[in-house]
Amino acid sequence: MPKVIRDLPDTSSYWAAVWSVCAMPDVHVICDAPIGCYNLVATAIPDYTDAIPNIDNITPSVITEEEVGGTGTAPAVQRTYDDLVTMKKISDDTKLIVVSTAESEMIGSDLTDLVKMLKPGTTFFHSESLTEDEWVGRDRILRWLWEQYGVDAGSVEPEPGLVNIIGPTYGCFNAPSDLHEVKRLIEGAGGRVNMVFPYESKLADIAQLAKAQYSVVLYKEFG
C-alpha cells in the first residue's frame, strides 16, 4: 500500500508571496484566485498567526467557473483592477502586484501582458504555487522584489555599522518577539538596524537595503 500523506507542514509559494509582499504598506496585491483561496491566506490564518483580523492590501479576482471554463482569468483581474480604481483603493504611490495561484496556474493563466495595460509599473509574479512550498517561495519572492524594484541600489553607498534583517513576514507565530530579540542581539554587538525587510519596510525603499554593511538573513525556524 502506498504511503498516504495525511497532512502537510508547509503552505504553498502563493501564501509565501502574499505574506511577504503584503507586509509592506505601499503595495496592493491582486491575487488571481477564487474567493476561498483569498479568505484563508488573507483573513483566517493571519488572524491566528499574527493577531490581525485581515490583510487590507490584497484583493481577489474571484475567478469562477466562467473563467476556468472559457474566458481565462484576465477579464476577472481587469474587473478587479477597475473596481479598485473606482473605489480609490490604490493611489499613485501604490505598487500594484498581480500574483498567480494554484487555481489560475492550473488553467495556464499568464498575465504578463495584461499587467502592462493596468496601472503603470504593475508587475506579475508567477508564484509557482503548484510546485513550490512556502520556503522556496519566500526566497524567490524576496529575490524577485529586489530584481524588479531595487534598480536604484547601485547609487546607494554602504554605511559602516548598518545591518539589514531580511526575512520576517506575516504567517509566523512569534515574529514580533523573535524580531525584537534579533534586533537586541545586533544592537548589543554594536550594530545599527538599517531595514527589516519586508516586515517593517516599504517597497519604495528597497534600494536602501544596499546601504547596510551586513545582512542577517533569517531561516524558517524564525517565528
Where do the language-model regions lie?
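An N-terminal assembly and electron-transfer interface module characteristic of large anaerobic redox
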Residues: M1-G223
